[in-house]
Amino acid sequence: MRILVTNDDGIDADGLSVLCSIMERFGEVYVVAPDNEQSAVGHSITLAQPLRMREVVRGGKLFGYAVNGTPADCVKLALYELSRRLFGEDSGPGSFDLLVSGLNRGANLGINAFYSGTVAAALEGVIAGVPSIAVSVEGYSQVDFGQAGGIARRVLARVIDCRSQVPWSFLNINIPSVPEGRIRGVRISKQNISGFQERFEERKDPRGETIYWMTGGIVPLQEKSDDDTKLLADGYVSVTPLCYDMTNYRLKERLEKIDMSHLVKEEQQ
């Protein structure tokens, strides 16, 4: 099995190295990641400047490729360009059997998943038809990637066979940052819809110009027992199936009951 590994923390991130070691147990690993941290860039892609992809060698061996772009850029380059270089001119996204993005420093829960470069990389993979999984670890300052990696390996081993059974879908896995003995288990979850209370701190830079730092916190909504935010807070590993079909089918059904057949004709009269 050919596995594409990427992230948004950058090619030098500890979590990426741990993930590579994990995925080598499952197949051939190919790494394409940003050359610097790209956290919270979402699903942005680079259009106004050229992309560069350079080889990264560690211990005398090729570790992977660093790209001066976003996680989505990395996935696109890997699936549509690097695949041709490695596997032949007729190769493309189908050359890879699986894409795994992570191990991200910091959980990607609720609506924060929309801002996450880690999740966006998995989304880009599934858009191209490659089964994809995003894996994140709670916490920022002190993250035990060794422990998280062991948990991720066991969870991935169980869910990896489900990766291609549902089109347009991928998995978003979040691991709590607590001692392993306190992790209560693994739960299938849904995405929490809590918003973010946006606030900005106004400061002055050394030149006396006004600058702003974004801050704030999660807007408390009623959490349900099976949503990702609640489960992680309760010490569970959350596994959330996500998809890129953003259609609101309930609203679509309601709108279809409204007679709009005459609206264009009225405008033309």
What are these regions (language model features)?
Residues 107-116:
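Glycine/threonine-rich flexible loop motifs
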Residues 2-3, 14-94:
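A cross-family phosphate/adenosyl-ligand binding-site feature
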Residues 121-125:
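Hydrophobic/aromatic ligand-binding patch that stacks against planar heteroaromatic rings
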Residues 133-162:
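Short, glycine-/small-residue-rich phosphate/pyrophosphate-handling segment
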Residues 5-12, 112:
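Short, glycine-rich nucleotide/cofactor-binding loops
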Residues 162-166, 176-269:
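C-terminal accessory domains and tails appended to enzymatic cores
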Residues 97-98:
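Conserved acidic residues
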